[in-house]
Amino acid sequence: MMHKHEAKIIWERKDQPFVDNKYSRAHLWEFDGVKVPASSSPAVLPVPLSSADAIDPEEALVAATSSCHMLFFLAIAAKQGFIVDHYNDQAYGVM
């Protein structure tokens, strides 16, 4: 069964220069009406071209993978009759 997943990505140039490649990469992700500040990673583009307080795509990929792993683990544990009271994963990715 296929499911449709949607995300809205919002970025505005405002009064920033653009053609010199010195524009902010800060933008918003919107899921189900919730807006999440996002940006390129400061490790890739330094502040002020990126926002250190925002989630970057690399972090989101690591978090999504970890979240999927947790949900899969919890489903298997429940189906096998195990009780899980707590789950904590300090996920990291190297890219």
Task: Identify the meaning behind each predicted range.
Residues 1-63, 74-95:
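Extended beta-strand/beta-hairpin segments
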